[in-house]
Amino acid sequence: MGVSGSKGQKLFVSVLQRLLSERGLHVKESSAIEFYQFLIKVSPWFPEEGGLNLQDWKRVGREMKKYAAEHGTDSIPKQAYPIWLQLREILTEQSDLVLLSAEAKSVTEEELEEGLTGLLSASSQEKTYGTRGTAYAEIDTEVDKLSEHIYDEPYEEKEKADKNEEKDHVRKVKKIVQRKENSEHKRKEKDQKAFLATDWNNDDLSPEDWDDLEEQAAHYHDDDELILPVKRKVDKKKPLALRRKPLPPVGFAGAMAEAREKGDLTFTFPVVFMGESDDDDTPVWEPLPLKTLKELQSAVRTMGPSAPYTLQVVDMVASQWLTPSDWHQTARATLSPGDYVLWRTEYEEKSKETVQKTAGKRKGKVSLDMLLGTGQFLSPSSQIKLSKDVLKDVTTNAVLAWRAIPPPGVKKTVLAGLKQGNEESYETFISRLEEAVYRVMPRGEGSDILIKQLAWENANSLCQDLIRPMRKTGTMQDYIRACLDASPAVVQGMAYAAAMRGQKYSTFVKQTYGGGKGGQGSKGPVCFSCGKTGHIKRDCKEEKGSKRAPPGLCPRCKKGYHWKSECKSKFDKDGNPLPPLETNAENSKNL
């Protein structure tokens, strides 16, 4: 740039803010000063020897990268890389304004006047640059932009004299342009008057003069049609900023973007596909949010790895495309060492089952190394090339292995041994049953069938009798509604009733709730006379016709219609005590 010290810093900051503002980007002055000071530290040669050109700027980028490798990324300002990338893009476009601003301080008054004169002469000869008025307006615009680049930032008091001197220099340049414009305009008016004063009735001209005259006339009319009045704007408005690409991401996301450009895929997880298939687009890798990992670790620590909330967080993590290495890192970071060993064992077992199931069913064969991340798929860079189908199998096996981890302090039980207690509510039993089944197999039609079968077989006797009428046609919701009344209090009362009747608890339940229709069993009502089912006492035919009806009141007690031999009263109708019953022989004599 050829300028150092505070003056060079102000010039660089002014040019930097102007260039970025034209791209719709606003950089604070403090950030620009911080970047300039860092630039001097990294490239001390730049203020004196360098310039805003693509070659020098690429050299600055290489030195910044070398500085980061030696001192670490924390030593680099946060906005250093984004500013360097934006300026590199501007310099690649070879903007005339950038080149003019970069060399503004080295242009002398004579060189500027010669450049303006050359531009005026070129604009008057070529139509591609428009009219002379347009050319002058372009020159004024460039001079004004140059002035704004240099003087839009106020200097200190000690530099006011230099500022006024440079403003006078710009005024002189404008006066030179105005003087040349006036002289050119006067020359044109003179040619116009001479052209109008020509006697067109005089045909005494040679053919060469006629050709020259026609050429001049044609040239004159072309220029006359293109002449526009030169209007100098006093209050100039800044042009609207064009829409430009936003600044690249900063921080860890910016480092990830730069790493992807350079091919460094060490921390590329999880995998993000933007399309619906593998051919729609290339996969993009983003880091798993740290907040999600913290939430998962907190849930495991406070509620356990198999708690419903923890499993919900695991499902949220599983909604992304994670490789085997990502799942191992996540499980190792959140689970305890013992639970991690259990998870890894279950994951390997599920992966082997997946390989056996998918053998010969897919075009692309799924190997155990793909699912486990071993062998040729040991490195993360090789795992990111796995297809979506393989990543789905990896996620499914990882979630199933996580659900197989038993709660803290609970031993792994067999499903057949998971039975409902006598005083346990049916909905609590169903909750335990679902948790155990989902820990073994994923949610689906197979797990629903297994839960329904065990909900009937492993229920207690009371709930089985309530469910029996709807066992084949009802759903799990029907089972739960039927057993809502089977509370511990009801079970305790039925146990007391069975004990008072001298029956077993299961027999009493069958007689009371069998079939679930108001105490009628599956084979009909129970007869109180003979004890058989299928009829009641009044319809009992067991001893009908074998006994004769008593003729009247009992001769012994005088208060009942029964035979004397069947009398069991101890007092007669008057309250007198009765003697014991006579024997069969004495009774036969009385008859």
Curated annotation (Swiss-Prot):
InterPro entries: B_retro_matrix, B_retro_matrix_sf, Gag_p24_C, Primate_lentivir_Gag_pol-like, Retrov_capsid_C, Retrov_capsid_N, Retrovr_matrix, Znf_CCHC. One of its GO terms (molecular function) is zinc ion binding. Transmembrane segments: none annotated. A zinc finger (CCHC-type) spans 525-542, 552-569. A motif (PTAP/PSAP motif) lies at residues 305-308. The record marks L99, L100, F195, L196, L228, P229, G254, A255, F269, P270, Y496, A497 as: Cleavage. Keywords: Capsid protein, DNA-binding, Host-virus interaction, Lipoprotein, Metal-binding, Myristate, Nucleotide-binding, Phosphoprotein, Repeat, Viral budding, Viral budding via the host ESCRT complexes, Viral matrix protein, Viral nucleoprotein, Viral release from host cell, Virion, Zinc, Zinc-finger. This is Gag polyprotein. It comes from Mouse mammary tumor virus (strain C3H).
